Amino acid sequence: MATLIYVDKENEEPGILVATKDGLKLGSGPSIKALDGRSQVSISCFGKTFDAPTSLPKATRKALGTVNRATEKSVKTNGPLKQKQPSFSAKKMTEKTVKAKNSVPASDDGYPEIEKLFPFNPLGFESFDLPEEHQIAHLPLSEVPLMILDEERELEKLFQLGPPSPLKMPSPPWKSNLLQSPLSILLTLDVELPPVCSDIDI
């Protein structure tokens, strides 16, 4: 870490040298440069370098001091004006809110027909039963394969069959021919491959 320290002659101690601990450990001595009647001490070290802010001459300090004082005075003069403005705008805001309250229609009178459009019964969403005409509780559905039915007539035929038995099982009305016998499916998947050449040495 390198630090730059300026020593003013006004402080009556121009010979002060400040070194960091790293600089003392490394054995690097500080170097002094003279700039405009001031002595500058710079210490070089390894790692990140940070520069201390340079001190300004008295003339610039006075100039900045007067600028700062001028801005403080302007802030003080603007302060009371800002306090008066909110009170003026508060009157306008109260007038606007009164006008808005008069212009907004009452919520009770507006749109009563919308509430009647959608009747809502929360108990209706808790029942998971099918209607009586579509009850399937009397059918033994264990181990029944998925069937895709074409029309309502086939559905009626299925209900007229009664409980299924392994001895009297009619052919189900399948919609597609995807569930064919395994041999027919394997025959469609057969692909002719080129003959194997046994003459080629591997």
Swiss-Prot record:
A motif (D-box) lies at residues 61-64. It is found in: Cytoplasm; Nucleus. One of its GO terms (molecular function) is SH3 domain binding. The keyword Lipoprotein does not apply. InterPro entries: Securin_separation_inhibitor (IPR006940). It comes from the Eukaryota. Its main location: cytoplasm. Residues 69-106 are annotated as: Disordered. One of its GO terms (cellular component) is cytoplasm. A motif (SH3-binding) lies at residues 163-173. Expressed in ovarian tumor and tumor cell lines (SK-OV-3 and PA1). Keywords: Cytoplasm, Nucleus, Proto-oncogene, SH3-binding. One of its GO terms (biological process) is chromosome organization. The keyword Nucleus applies. The N-terminal destruction box (D-box) acts as a recognition signal for degradation via the ubiquitin-proteasome pathway. Belongs to the securin family. This is Putative pituitary tumor-transforming gene 3 protein. The lineage of its organism: Eukaryota, Metazoa, Chordata, Craniata, Vertebrata.
